[in-house]
């Protein structure tokens, strides 16, 4: 059975609310309606102030980025092949992989909801040093990632900036999805 239209957006919104330390039930308080529509939720000014600055939902980042500012990103996949593509400033690296249909097996299995570590990437030192601070939630997921390094981050939590133009990120040789067993094969 297919998910109702907007279900992915609702899951992402729930993850964003949880990411900011708020109670996810606030999104679902209005209950279900007849038909496939997802309930509307409008945050109060207090809720917005409580949320504070944080990484926007990937969907919001795309909507906000009205200009076509793009940066080039090089992904070194598990086979050692370099996949070069462009992404919009403000999009997450997970968005870039999905929107450009890059051949990275199993990447982003949870669709950016911080429920797995399949979008684990390893950054160059000079780029890693400039990334926003890592959250406790992301750190918890990274603890379960295969091939963790001191320059590891989740692609769903890193948004592109102009300073990242022409960066190279490496995909670890194996994937550890906390929802499943570890996949040690390069081409599963």
From Swiss-Prot:
Protein name, entry field: Adrenodoxin, mitochondrial
Origin organism lineage: Eukaryota, Metazoa, Chordata, Craniata, Vertebrata
Purpose of the protein: Essential for the synthesis of various steroid hormones. Participates in the reduction of mitochondrial cytochrome P450 for steroidogenesis. Transfers electrons from adrenodoxin reductase to CYP11A1, a cytochrome P450 that catalyzes cholesterol side-chain cleavage. Does not form a ternary complex with adrenodoxin reductase and CYP11A1 but shuttles between the two enzymes to transfer electrons.
CDD domains reported for this sequence: fer2 (cd00207)
N6-acetyllysine PTM positions: 70
A Pfam family per the record: Fer2
Sites bearing N6-succinyllysine, chain numbering: 70, 162
Domain called 2Fe-2S ferredoxin-type: residue spans: 69-175
Record key words, sorted: 2Fe-2S, Acetylation, Cholesterol metabolism, Electron transport, Iron, Iron-sulfur, Lipid metabolism, Metal-binding, Mitochondrion, Phosphoprotein, Steroid metabolism, Steroidogenesis, Sterol metabolism, Transit peptide, Transport
Gene Ontology biological-process annotations: adrenal gland development; cellular response to cAMP; cellular response to epinephrine stimulus; cellular response to forskolin; cellular response to leptin stimulus; cholesterol metabolic process; electron transport chain; hormone biosynthetic process
Location (main, coarse): mitochondrion
Tissue expression profile of the protein: Found in all tissues, most abundant in adrenals, ovaries and testes.
Top-level taxon of origin: Eukaryota
GO cellular component terms listed in the entry, alphabetical order: mitochondrial crista; mitochondrial matrix; mitochondrion
């Amino acid at each position: 059975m297919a998910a109702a239209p907007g279900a992915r957006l609702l899951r992402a919104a729930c993850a964003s609310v949880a990411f900011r330390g708020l109670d996810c039930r606030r999104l679902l308080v209005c209950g279900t309606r007849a038909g496939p529509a997802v309930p509307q939720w409008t945050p109060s000014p207090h809720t917005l102030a409580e949320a504070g600055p944080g990484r926007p939902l990937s969907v919001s980042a795309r909507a906000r980025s009205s200009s076509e500012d793009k940066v080039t990103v090089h992904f070194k996949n598990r086979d050692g092949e370099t996949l070069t593509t462009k992404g919009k400033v403000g999009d997450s690296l997970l968005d870039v992989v999905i929107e450009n249909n890059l051949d990275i097996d199993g990447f982003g299995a949870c669709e950016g909801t911080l429920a797995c570590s399949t979008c684990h990437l390893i950054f160059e030192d000079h780029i890693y040093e400039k990334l926003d601070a890592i959250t406790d939630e992301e750190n918890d997921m990274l603890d379960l990632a295969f091939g963790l390094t001191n320059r590891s981050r989740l692609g769903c939590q890193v948004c592109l900036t102009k300073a990242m133009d022409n960066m190279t990120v490496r995909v670890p040789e194996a994937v550890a999805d906390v929802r499943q067993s570890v996949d040690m094969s390069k081409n599963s």
